[in-house]
Amino acid sequence: MVDSLKKPGFEEIRPGVKVPAKETLLTPRFYTTDFDEMARMDISVNEDELLAILEEFRTDYNRHHFVRDAEFEKSWDHIDGDTRRLFVEFLERSCTAEFSGFLLYKELGRRLKDKSPVLAECFNLMSRDEARHAGFLNKAMSDFNLSLDLGFLTKSRNYTFFKPKFIFYATYLSEKIGYWRYITIYRHLEAHPEDRIYPIFRFFENWCQDENRHGDFFDAIMKSQPQMLNDWKAKLWSRFFLLSVFATMYLNDIQRKDFYATIGLDARDYDIYVIKKTNETAGRVFPIILDVDSPEFYERLDICVENSEKLSAIASSNTPKFLQFFQKLPVLASTGWQLLRLYLMKPIDAVSAQGAAR
């Protein structure tokens, strides 16, 4: 009974080492890219900004930040049951996302070292930050008697290939939405310390600045490649990646609304705020942004959430697998239709939006 409280419902590779969460469309992805194409990029158009960002990376503002203090040195067995399960899942998803960034940035730093030294050093220093984050999160998991085998994760995950342009879109949004997620949680718990169930949240203010600087780096890279931002295809891809990132976060978080409730947040309100701020931030580099203030945007996402719950119910039923397939088809079609309608919603011209904001 004690073990079930400490490790509620988690499979283990070996004692204390958790089996990684099953890969789905909603789990953090591991990426690879065309390293030669990236090495050939001419960054001279925006090299001054990239060099300034490199100096910030070298300064390493957070080199003494990720140090566990006395508040961690206690038993956390009072966090049990569903709260414990949800919190471990939160730590695992966060650790996996940070570690995937580490692997990508480390490989880019290695591959670009001789051909594009400025980018190579930036990627190496960002991989340093991501490794710190992943290690800190994995150590936090050990407070709950579990951890991830990051070496096993490296070898067992499928890697998604993206051309450099798409890597930049995806990682820029990942870093910027990470900033808004962390700082929003930090500010909420700063105002409501009674909801801070675990000390890791105290670290989020400085932590999120790493995410912000990384996002600024990808902003600067894209601005060094104007062809990535200035044609009609850039507008279509901007819409695609914005919608993909927002929909993935929304479906993940609403499914785990009980976790956010444990720290005093309403998951839907939290996501609406984070999406709004990330969308505004993306307008500084993307040619278009989404109309996330339209009621239709969340009405359609909420239908996707309902469909996701239906799919989970079908998958966990005793219905034979071949019948489950046919039961899922109309639900999947409905989700696909909602996402298509969201993609086709009229976007907002980012230049006009920035002008209105000023």
Curated annotation (Swiss-Prot):
It is an enzyme of class 1 (oxidoreductase). Pathway: Porphyrin-containing compound metabolism; chlorophyll biosynthesis (light-independent). Pfam families: Rubrerythrin. Its cofactor is Fe cation. InterPro entries: AcsF, Ferritin-like_SF, Rr_diiron-bd_dom. CDD domains: ACSF. The keyword Oxidoreductase applies. It comes from the Bacteria. It catalyses: Mg-protoporphyrin IX 13-monomethyl ester + 3 NADPH + 3 O2 + 2 H(+) = 3,8-divinyl protochlorophyllide a + 3 NADP(+) + 5 H2O. One of its GO terms (biological process) is photosynthesis. The keyword tRNA-binding does not apply. One of its GO terms (molecular function) is magnesium-protoporphyrin IX monomethyl ester (oxidative) cyclase activity. Its EC number is 1.14.13.81. Keywords: Chlorophyll biosynthesis, Iron, Metal-binding, NADP, Oxidoreductase, Photosynthesis. HAMAP family: AcsF. Catalyzes the formation of the isocyclic ring in chlorophyll biosynthesis. Mediates the cyclase reaction, which results in the formation of divinylprotochlorophyllide (Pchlide) characteristic of all chlorophylls from magnesium-protoporphyrin IX 13-monomethyl ester (MgPMME). Belongs to the AcsF family. NCBIfam families: AcsF, PRK13654.1. This is Magnesium-protoporphyrin IX monomethyl ester [oxidative] cyclase 3. It comes from Nostoc sp. (strain PCC 7120 / SAG 25.82 / UTEX 2576). The lineage of its organism: Bacteria, Bacillati, Cyanobacteriota, Cyanophyceae, Nostocales.
